[in-house]
């Protein structure tokens, strides 16, 4: 890849009300002083699925191959790349070391496919701390849950 490759910062977060339950995801993309916020909702999901969905949608929002600094407070997402879990899972036909199937294979496979287009640096951030963009993602994700469940209270 050339030296002229764009560098983009992507912050992501997922949230779930109950696990499983209604969930929201969000990503904030930063590029040359421009900020783009994206978020979405799923009716019945898990926190880990929302964390993965946030990363997938953040990367999908890129229009061309980029160098990406991707920030997440999800150990599940970051460790899968940093600790080599994904390579092991693929080598073992998507089975964990205890021989049970890896959860969320559909999203992991989608994430692997889309991340091939980019040079991704996976960065763990502390959740609910003082990181402006991680906190923004958290607010956007939880707002999706509130907005989409307000009409259908379960109580």
From Swiss-Prot:
Enzyme class: hydrolase
Coiled-coil intervals, chain numbering: none
Keyword line: Cytoplasm, Endonuclease, Hydrolase, Magnesium, Metal-binding, Nuclease
Amino-acid positions noted as binding Mg(2+) 2 in the UniProt annotation, renumbered to this chain: 13, 138
EC identifiers of the protein: 3.1.26.4
Note describing how the cofactor binds: Binds 1 Mg(2+) ion per subunit. May bind a second metal ion at a regulatory site, or after substrate binding.
Cofactor(s) essential for the protein: Mg(2+)
GO biological process per UniProt: DNA replication, removal of RNA primer
The keyword Magnesium is assigned to this record: yes
Residue intervals of the RNase H type-1 domain: 4-146
Record-linked InterPro entries: RNase_H (IPR050092), RNaseH-like_sf (IPR012337), RNaseH_domain (IPR002156), RNaseH_sf (IPR036397), RNaseHI (IPR022892)
GO molecular function: magnesium ion binding; nucleic acid binding; RNA-DNA hybrid ribonuclease activity
Residues at which Mg(2+) 1 binds: 13, 51, 73
Reactions it catalyzes: Endonucleolytic cleavage to 5'-phosphomonoester
Gene Ontology terms: cellular component: cytoplasm
Subcellular location: Cytoplasm
Job of this protein: Endonuclease that specifically degrades the RNA of RNA-DNA hybrids.
PANTHER family, per the entry: RIBONUCLEASE H1
Subunit record text: Monomer.
Family stated for the protein in its record: Belongs to the RNase H family.
Protein name per Swiss-Prot or TrEMBL: Ribonuclease H
The species this protein was found in: Thermoanaerobacter pseudethanolicus (strain ATCC 33223 / 39E)
């Amino acid at each position: 890849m050339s030296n002229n490759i764009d560098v983009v910062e992507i912050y992501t977060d997922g949230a779930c009300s109950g696990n499983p339950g209604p969930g929201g995801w969000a990503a904030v993309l930063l590029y040359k002083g421009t900020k783009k916020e994206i978020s979405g909702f799923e009716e019945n999901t898990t926190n880990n699925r929302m964390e993965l969905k946030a990363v997938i949608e953040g990367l999908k929002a890129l229009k061309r191959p980029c160098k990406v600094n991707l920030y997440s407070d999800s150990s599940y997402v970051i460790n899968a790349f940093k600790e080599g879990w994904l390579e092991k899972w693929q080598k073992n036909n998507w089975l964990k070391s205890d021989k049970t199937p890896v959860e969320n294979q559909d999203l992991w496979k989608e994430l692997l496919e889309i991340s091939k287009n980019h040079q991704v640096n996976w960065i763990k951030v502390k959740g609910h701390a003082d990181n402006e963009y991680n906190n923004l993602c958290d607010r956007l994700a939880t707002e999706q849950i509130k907005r989409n469940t307000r009409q259908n209270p379960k109580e």
